[in-house]
Amino acid sequence: MEKLSEALDLLQEELLSLYEQNSQSLADQSRHWSLLRKEQVLLYYARGKGIMRIGMQPVPPQSVSQAKAKQAIEQSLYIDSLLHSKYANEPWTLCDTSRERLVAEPAYTFKKGGKQIDVRYGDSEENIVRYVLWLDIYYQDEFDTWEKAHGKLDHKGLSYMHGTQQVYYVDFEEEANKYSETGKYEILNQPTTIPTTSAAGTSGPELPGHSASGSGACSLTPRKGPSRRPGRRSSRFPRRSGGRGRLGRGGSGELPPQPQPSSSWSPPSPQQVGSKHQLRTTSSAGGRLGRLLQEAYDPPVLVLAGDPNSLKCIRYRLSHKHRGLYLGASTTWKWTSGGDGASKHDRGSARMLLAFLSDQQREDFMDRVTFPKSVRVFRGGLDEL
């Protein structure tokens, strides 16, 4: 058991080092998938020995580890083949070589430079489907030689040239038969560039974290099925100001009133502790006493967003090297559903909370601890811990 734990720790340290390097080398991406395969093999072996948990990490069923190991092997074969092509020296990020990116349409091709295309089907203004137009598509010809083509948009659909043949990987007419009764469709927007990597932390591109699929949070995938028109807000729920909501503690379900601003500083009542809905500002008004009184309303937290296994690696490292700098860490979790604003929570990535005793402890933590660029970090607060 101890040897298994040491082996898993070593693999995860190597993976976390790769994420921190933010490498654009295809050789490093090949190494990344090799490490993922080894991790799944180790977990498969551990479950076969009846081990349910290694350290803080649950051991999945053997069928899960086996399937993910096979995916990692297949991914490695494609990347290693690309390594021997004329495109090997191009910049390749973890996003570009992710599993989800590889199997997205057109399937089993590498893709770069996604742009979103919204198409409305039928007569309903809200019956909109989002697709991705890939600027560069790398495919294998009949001789298994890698070639590069540019994605195209026309009235018929999204396509690329496979040699001398134009291949449509999205056919709008076929999609119209699926999503509408009239067969009508309308392309709503000219291609608008979507960054293939998004801001991470305070700056820098976002890369996927460590996941068994290797997809991470950076992939651009089409939004299948009818959806609400972008920018449209449902009228079922009233609009509420403030950057952060809170769950009620029973009763009528109405939001508790906000504490009214006062001309003088006074401590919060027991009913007001944890009652603020907006993040604290960094204003120094009121001095240290004012800051402490403000902190009494909301215990401070940090929210880490990224790939779930990458967050687990970070939690492991924090528990061993920075244990005294924070109060506690949560398990990883994801947004699973929501209304119009759900997409901004990036349901493809996981979240993990770090709790602190005070704002000052949180700032000291931020000054001393660094995170890989694949992980976004932002501040928040909770009613209680």
UniProtKB/Swiss-Prot annotation:
Major location (coarse)? host cell
What Pfam families would the database entry show? PPV_E2_C, PPV_E2_N
**Keywords assigned by UniProt, alphabetized:** Activator, DNA replication, DNA-binding, Early protein, Host nucleus, Phosphoprotein, Repressor, Transcription, Transcription regulation
Q: Where is this region: Transactivation domain?
A: 1-199
Subcellular locations according to the entry: Host nucleus
Specify residue ranges for compositional bias: Low complexity: 261-275
> Does the keyword section mention Transmembrane?
no
What post-translational changes are documented for it? Answer: Phosphorylated.
GO BP, sorted A to Z: DNA replication; DNA-templated transcription; regulation of DNA replication; viral DNA genome replication
Q: Where is this region: Disordered?
A: 189-282
- Compositional bias of type Polar residues: which residue ranges? 189-201
Q: What does this protein do?
A: Plays a role in the initiation of viral DNA replication. A dimer of E2 interacts with a dimer of E1 in order to improve specificity of E1 DNA binding activity. Once the complex recognizes and binds DNA at specific sites, the E2 dimer is removed from DNA. E2 also regulates viral transcription through binding to the E2RE response element (5'-ACCNNNNNNGGT-3') present in multiple copies in the regulatory regions of the viral genome. Activates or represses transcription depending on E2RE's position with regards to proximal promoter elements including the TATA-box.
Q: What is this protein called?
A: Regulatory protein E2
Q: What species is this protein from?
A: Canine oral papillomavirus (strain Y62)
Encoding gene (name) = E2
